[in-house]
């Protein structure tokens, strides 16, 4: 016999004049009220379990356009940082042996052009290690390395390298659970990526 039938039997007993003890009536009412009050709690709990389902969250995250854009940004930042590191340690970034000129220059101008291209092809760590130059090439080399624009370029490159490290780490931090809830997390990454692109 379920709760509803007990309640109906109690009401029918009252109508038919059947004596029902106060204890039995109170027990039936308490049982009914407890069942009715617990039903929304169970319903809300099942809804919450449905909402917090790990499979559902994983499906929403992996198919979200925002998540895909974040993954692309982090991987592109990692690729750019790898290229910056290669440029630092490379000895020959440009293949200047295959350069051909369509206009004949004097030997002095041609030497300066080749020296300039060679300096641009060197990594940051190998600029001051090259000593296999003739006197004219060494003068052109020193002229390039002592130029103020070259110093500005070095500072800019070092800043871009430092920001590349920070931005690459920052864009990979959202893969750690709980860090996306931090305030202004996305805005800081956006500002750093803009600064790196400006450099």
Swiss-Prot record:
Main location: membrane
Keyword field: Developmental protein, Differentiation, Membrane, Phosphoprotein, Spermatogenesis, Transmembrane, Transmembrane helix
Region spans: Disordered: 1-25
Domain of life: Eukaryota
Membrane topology: Multi-pass membrane protein
Subcellular localization(s) per the UniProt record: Membrane
Membrane-spanning ranges: 68-88, 109-128, 159-179
An example Gene Ontology biological process: spermatogenesis
Sites of Phosphoserine modification: 53
Gene Ontology CC terms: membrane
Compositional bias segments (type: Basic and acidic residues): 1-14
This protein's record includes keyword Metal-binding: no
General function of this protein: Component of the outer dense fibers (ODF) of spermatozoa which could be involved in sperm tail structure, sperm movement and general organization of cellular cytoskeleton.
Protein name: Outer dense fiber protein 4
Source organism of the structure: Bos taurus (Bovine)
């Amino acid at each position: 016999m379920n709760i509803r039938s007990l309640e109906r039997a109690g009401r029918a007993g009252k109508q038919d004049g059947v004596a029902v003890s106060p204890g039995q009536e109170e027990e039936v009412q308490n049982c009914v009220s407890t069942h009715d009050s617990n039903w929304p709690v169970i319903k809300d709990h099942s809804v919450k379990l449905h909402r917090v389902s790990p499979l559902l969250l994983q499906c929403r995250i992996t198919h979200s356009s925002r998540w895909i854009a974040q993954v692309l940004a982090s991987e592109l930042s990692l690729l750019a940082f790898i290229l910056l590191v290669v440029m630092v340690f490379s000895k020959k970034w440009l293949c200047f042996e295959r350069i051909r000129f369509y206009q004949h220059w004097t030997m002095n101008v041609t030497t300066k052009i080749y020296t300039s291209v060679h300096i641009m092809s060197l990594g940051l760590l190998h600029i001051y290690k090259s000593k296999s130059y003739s006197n004219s090439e060494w003068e052109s080399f020193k002229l390039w390395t002592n130029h103020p624009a070259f110093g500005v370029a070095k500072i800019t490159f070092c800043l871009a390298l430092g920001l590349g490290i920070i931005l690459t780490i920052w864009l990979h931090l959202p893969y750690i659970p709980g860090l996306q809830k931090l305030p202004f997390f996305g805005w800081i990454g956006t500002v750093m990526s803009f600064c790196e692109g400006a450099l």
